[in-house]
Curated annotation (Swiss-Prot):
Domain Thioredoxin: 58-184, 380-526
Coiled coil: none
GO molecular function: protein disulfide isomerase activity
Name of the featured protein: Protein disulfide isomerase-like 1-5
Residues at the catalytic site: C106, C447, C450
Motif residue range(s): Prevents secretion from ER: 534-537
UniProt-listed Enzyme Commission number(s): 5.3.4.1
Signal peptide: 1-29
UniProt source species: Arabidopsis thaliana (Mouse-ear cress)
GO cellular component: endoplasmic reticulum; endoplasmic reticulum lumen; nucleus
Length: 537
């Protein structure tokens, strides 16, 4: 499991928010203990085998009496506990070793461990040769460091001693599929009808391939796609009856590929060419539900969607259910162009990082918004959400007719103002599209030095009063935004937008005195057109 978020880039608002969300899912640093107790356990292999043998005998003797706790206990004993030099011996002595690095104090580790144990049980049952192990990286920090475990929880697959970082989902099924793909078993073959129900009990999302023979170009491309995809289980069969059990919508006995998902849009037929790239493209566009519920553990998966224009509905669960059916119809209509995501608005850890971008405080009112991760833009449905208004909003997004949303204060009255107040909604008109040169002061309420600079700007505005081609303006960056107002967090900031060159504003040093700024304005704007300079304050 990848633990360290990629560096945050200013070019993508949605990327930034998803990485914020990852902070709720992942702990990226761990503490080192005062002592590092490490010991060998040379008899652990035989002890483990004996424990598993006892478990299997008990299950045979009283299968109906096994409690859930006993089942979990058995699963956890399948996972080898590593420590000290024993770790290196295990990794070097086995072709495939999956290691979970955890810490006892880490809540996410505690959540993942039973799923990891469940995956270990499933892999053992299907005859996988991978050895599943775990190590307390807090206690055995030296070994954890040597394994390059840099945070908790971390999942690493060692193939002949070389590690691969796990980058899949957090469910047991996700882990099993990923491990199978990486250890040489990307496809499950079903030969008889009797095998199908057992398969359906274990797998809820899968790709079905029906072939006359497991050879030829079409099958080869299917296999290549199975090896390239790390998320979805691929299944192959030569028996059309098996295929129809798995995919009841199957109408033909010819070569066939289809995707099965556990949701409203359960069966999706692939009708493209039999090329690996096209099959993977089909999966990328169709693997998500019509409406994906965002959780702390699936943010990376959501971000992997090739559909980067994403509609997000924030509401309470009951309110979402009331809209569920019409929303599914809308999502189906715009499936190839928009991705639809539901966020429980009562989960502040998930909802608030998004809502704060729109200046929306915590509440229970349904909000519909959208992010375009390619254009770094966001949109907001400002009317009351209803099936009709949501569909109209989505249609506008798909056709590019919805205006971008900028967080903005109300438009102020600037009549007779010596310094124009700019807000998000007026940035285009007053700054970018105006014919005048604009000296813009960017400030925030918490800025220590902003008040002193504001007084200098007011003095300059009075000094240059009467110069029609020069406008003094200011904007509160904490309450207003615009995609072309790209500034750092060091306020105050002075920007000069020269007429005809608005795309490349000049940034002035805030250490300049009022006289220095006056000289700069005169040299940049006034002297070329007017021989009379006005720099004496």
């Amino acid at each position: 499991m990848s633990l360290i978020p990629k560096p945050i880039s200013k070019v993508s608002t949605f990327t930034f928010i998803l990485l914020i969300l990852l902070s709720f899912t992942i702990i990226i640093a761990y503490s080192s203990p005062d002592s590092n107790v490490e010991s060998n356990e040379p008899g652990f292999d035989s002890d483990l085998d004996q424990l598993l043998a006892v478990d299997e005998q008990l299950q045979e003797d009283r299968p109906e009496q096994q409690s859930e706790a006993e089942t979990v206990s058995k699963a956890q004993r399948i996972v080898l506990e590593l420590n000290g030099d024993y770790t290196k011996r295990v990794i070097d002595g086995n072709e495939f070793v999956m290691v979970l690095g955890y810490a006892p104090w880490c809540a996410r580790s505690a959540e993942l461990m039973p799923r990891f144990a469940e995956a270990a049980t499933a892999l053992k049952e299907i005859g996988s040769s991978v050895l599943m192990a775990k190590i307390d990286g807090d206690r055995y920090s030296k070994i954890a460091s040597e394994l390059e475990i840099k945070g908790f929880p971390t999942l690493l697959l060692f193939v002949n001693g070389t590690s691969l970082t796990y980058n899949g989902g957090s469910s047991a099924e996700d882990i099993v599929i990923w491990v199978q793909k990486k250890t040489g078993a990307p496809i499950i073959t079903l030969n008889t009808v009797d095998e199908a129900p057992r398969f359906l009990d274990k797998y809820h999302t899968f790709v079905l391939g029906l072939f006359e023979k497991f050879e030829g170009s079409e099958h080869n491309e299917f296999v290549k796609a199975a090896k390239s995809d790390d998320e979805i289980q691929f299944i192959e069969t030569r028996d059309s009856d098996v295929a129809k059990l798995l995919f009841p919508d199957l109408k033909s006995n010819n070569v066939f590929i289809g995707l099965v998902k556990p949701e409203a849009e359960r069966y999706t037929v692939y009708d493209g060419s039999y090329k690996m790239e096209k099959i993977l493209e089909f999966l990328g566009s169709n693997k998500f539900p019509l409406f994906t519920k965002l959780t702390e553990t699936n943010t990376v998966w959501v971000y992997s969607s090739p559909v980067k224009l994403q509609v997000m509905l924030f509401s309470k669960a009951d309110d979402f259910q009331k809209l569920a059916q019409p929303l599914e119809d809308i999502a189906r209509k715009f499936k190839s162009k928009l991705m639809f995501i539901y966020v429980d608005i009562t989960n502040e850890n998930l909802a608030m990082p998004f809502l704060i971008l729109f200046g929306i405080e915590a509440g229970n009112k349904t909000v519909v918004a959208a992010f375009d991760n390619n254009l770094n833009s966001k949109y907001l449905l400002e009317s009351d959400p209803s099936p009709n208004s949501i569909e109209e909003f989505c249609s506008g997004l798909a056709h590019g007719t919805v205006s971008r949303y900028y967080r903005s204060e109300p438009v102020p009255d600037n009549e007779n103002a010596s310094i124009v107040t700019v807000v998000g909604k007026t940035f285009d008109g007053l700054v970018l599209n105006s014919r005048e040169n604009v000296l813009l002061e960017v400030h925030t309420p918490w800025c220590v030095n902003c008040e002193a600079l504001s007084k200098q700007i007011e003095k300059l505005a009075k000094h240059f009063k009467g110069f029609e081609n020069l406008v003094f303006a200011r904007i509160d960056a904490s309450a207003n935004e615009h995609t072309k107002l790209q500034v750092d967090d060091k306020y105050p900031i002075i920007l000069l937008y020269k007429s005809g060159e608005k795309e490349k504003p000049l940034k002035l040093s805030t250490k300049l005195s009022a006289k220095d700024i006056a000289v700069f304005i005169n040299e940049e704007l006034l002297k070329p057109k007017n021989g009379s300079a006005k720099d004496e304050l």
